[in-house]
From Swiss-Prot:
Disruption-associated phenotype: No visible phenotype under normal growth conditions, but the accumuluation of N-(4-oxoglutarate)-L-cysteinylglycine (deaminated glutathione) in mutant plants is up to 70-fold higher than in the wild type.
Transit peptide: 1-36
Gene3D superfamilies (alphabetical): Carbon-nitrogen hydrolase (3.60.110.10)
Superkingdom as given in the UniProt entry: Eukaryota
Family to which this protein belongs: Belongs to the nitrilase superfamily. NIT1/NIT2 family.
Outcome (variant: residue 29 to L): No cytoplasmic localization
Gene Ontology cellular-component terms listed: chloroplast; cytoplasm; plastid
TM annotation in the entry: none
EC number: 3.5.1.128
Organism annotation: Arabidopsis thaliana (Mouse-ear cress)
Name by which UniProt lists this protein: Deaminated glutathione amidase, chloroplastic/cytosolic
The keyword Protein biosynthesis is assigned to this record: no
Length: 307
């Protein structure tokens, strides 16, 4: 299991292609042709400037592509983090808008799949959807998931959050087949609700769980790694958790610590600096998934409990 970070320059993307469709890639594509496949997870500190964030994402995409990754995962709010109330709703766009157009072009020009967690998708004049978008290496949108569990929390230390005041929750659990296995899509606060991950694993047959996030510094220090490792262990899936990191503005700071975790709960990818911008790269080993699930067949041993 290899993991490392790299740093390179990027080239500017050009044209745009978009199509929304259900995945047509068979699950056996990745598991029978190649027993291992490389993935990357990005860490960044997004700000309230769409083009600045796109430049950072473009550079990280090129790093991942040159490292041989077939998929790179970005954190929640990759394209924008506002520093004033209402900013995120103001800049929200539909999936066929210019922001997503740029990222579709980037995926196609770089020949790599993108997991874009926490895109501000326009719902109406006062609300958005926190949408996880998966784009293939042809620049096509393969599927989307809208965050179901919204962050309405009083964080120890005085900060309060009310995501539901401007975000419409999703209602559908989503998985999508890809060259790196069957992906289970979630976003950030979903991590605290195991049932969605259980459904992705046991009902939708996910092999890799994606958790793009922007954990607060306080909650991240207390719970980030242990929650991620728990989700990996209880589902016997790889977990890729791309994280926002550091100070976005005077009011907001994210924990960072982007991680890739294997089905046994072992951290196999981690940046050396918890809050630095960069990527971590690791190999998804399908033989390990098979081995863990065969030796401990929890999918066959689960008992239905009605309370």
């Amino acid at each position: 299991m290899n993991a490392y970070s790299v740093s390179l320059d990027f080239t500017k993307p050009s044209l745009f292609t978009r199509i929304t469709l259900s995945s047509q890639i068979p699950l056996t594509m990745a598991t029978t042709v190649n027993k291992t496949v490389r993935v990357a997870a990005a860490q960044m500190t997004s700000v309230n400037d769409l083009m600045t964030n796109f430049a950072t994402c473009s550079r990280l995409v090129q790093e991942a592509a040159l490292a041989g990754a077939k998929l790179i995962c970005f954190p929640e709010n990759f394209s924008f983090v506002g520093d004033k109330e209402g900013e995120s709703v103001k800049i929200a766009e539909p999936l066929d808008g210019p922001v997503m157009e740029r990222y579709c072009s980037l995926a196609r020009d770089s020949n790599i799949w993108l997991s874009l967690g926490g895109f501000q998708e326009r719902f109406d004049d006062t609300h958005l959807c926190n949408t996880h978008v998966v784009i293939d290496d042809a620049g096509m949108i393969r599927d989307t998931y809208q965050k179901m569990h919204l962050f309405d929390v009083d964080v120890p230390g005085g900060s309060s959050y009310k995501e539901s005041s401007f975000t419409v929750p999703g209602t559908k659990i989503v998985s999508v087949d890809s060259p790196v296995g069957r992906l289970g899509l979630t976003v950030c606060y979903d991590l605290r609700f195991p049932k969605i991950y259980q459904q992705l694993r046991f009902e939708q047959k996910a092999q890799v769980l994606l958790v793009p996030s922007a954990f607060t510094k306080v909650t991240g220090e207390a719970h980030w790694e242990i929650l991620l490792r728990a989700r990996a262990i209880e589902t016997q899936c790889y977990v890729i958790a791309a994280a926002q990191a550091g100070k976005h503005n005077e009011k907001r700071e994210s924990y960072g610590d982007t991680l890739i975790i294997d089905p046994w709960g072992t951290v196999v990818g981690r940046l050396p600096d918890r809050v630095s911008t960069g990527i971590v790269v690791a190999d998804i080993d399908f033989s390990l998934i098979d081995s863990v699930r065969t030796k401990m067949p929890i999918d066959k041993q689960r008992v239905s409990i009605d309370l």
